[in-house]
Amino acid sequence: MTMIKLEQIFWHVWINGDLVPYQFARIHVLTHSLHYSGSVFEGERAYNGKVFKLKEHTERLIKSAEALGLKVPYSVDEIIKAHELVIKQNNIKDAYIRPLIWCGDESLNITNPDLSTNLLIAGIPSMPRSFEKGINLHVGRWRKAIPDSTPVQSKSAAQYNMAITSKKEAKALGYDDALLLDYEGYIAECTTTNIFFVKDKTLYTPIADRFLNGITRQTIIEIAKDLGLEVKEERLKLEQIENFTGCFVTGTAIEVQNIDSIDLGNKKITFDDHQIADRLKKEYGRIVRE
């Protein structure tokens, strides 16, 4: 998915019940969440004017907020209707959709009962991106946080600080992204995507209890099983990677993306078998446009 420049967007954004022209959608510089990363969000895709798995995304958005102690002033149904307004107002066909919940600018105290909870829903025009070329990874130096130190199933802005840093470092070193390990050294995920490995007709993927269990990840697992593939969720070590013939990552924006290689530092593992990933990609592309 390729996005156009933000300053070229002339759509309307839904903010706390109002449709606001994109160029007038602003927040105060003393907004609490801007200073303390106290916001949660979702990344969604609209295909042919319909957001894929909107209910699941909305339910997770609310759960993410509740995990941070935020009281969301809207129900699942109300948020879904707000999405529909954004899509209708902007005549959206294919787009990336970003709902965001954040604390207001009433106070900069770490906690304050008077802080407002706000919601916006924005659409960003997108175009399909070519997936002909696979991407190359290295093992990032930063590890995922211990699950009992942060709510890992909350899609919060704070969770992305390390991911952004890791991706920047990967790019600076000539890679496309970083493979991240958990606190025990097991394979976790990439910076913004979940990872799968392939051997024969079996998919292997890390257990999603130490990182966000992606909605695209869950969808791909369902598709794989429907296609007769076996899926094993396990603790995976770096030394196991050379036993696999294929590798790919999943995410809302990237959908299904082949991995060509992973640099382990002492050796580089390459993957030539993309048949299963391509099959899953094709089926996923069909389902999201139904």
Swiss-Prot record:
Any Pfam family hit: Aminotran_4
Enzyme class of the recorded protein, top EC level: transferase
Modified residues (N6-(pyridoxal phosphate)lysine): 155
Cofactor: pyridoxal 5'-phosphate
EC number: 2.6.1.42
Keyword Secreted: no
Pathway stated in the Swiss-Prot or TrEMBL entry: Amino-acid biosynthesis; L-isoleucine biosynthesis; L-isoleucine from 2-oxobutanoate: step 4/4; Amino-acid biosynthesis; L-leucine biosynthesis; L-leucine from 3-methyl-2-oxobutanoate: step 4/4; Amino-acid biosynthesis; L-valine biosynthesis; L-valine from pyruvate: step 4/4
Reactions performed catalytically: L-leucine + 2-oxoglutarate = 4-methyl-2-oxopentanoate + L-glutamate; L-isoleucine + 2-oxoglutarate = (S)-3-methyl-2-oxopentanoate + L-glutamate; L-valine + 2-oxoglutarate = 3-methyl-2-oxobutanoate + L-glutamate
Signal peptide: none
Keyword tRNA-binding included in the entry's annotation: no
Keywords, sorted A to Z: Amino-acid biosynthesis, Aminotransferase, Branched-chain amino acid biosynthesis, Pyridoxal phosphate, Transferase
Similarity remark: Belongs to the class-IV pyridoxal-phosphate-dependent aminotransferase family.
Summary of the function given for this chain in its UniProt record: Acts on leucine, isoleucine and valine.
Protein name according to UniProt: Probable branched-chain-amino-acid aminotransferase
Organism: Rickettsia felis (strain ATCC VR-1525 / URRWXCal2) (Rickettsia azadi)
Species classification: Bacteria, Pseudomonadati, Pseudomonadota, Alphaproteobacteria, Rickettsiales
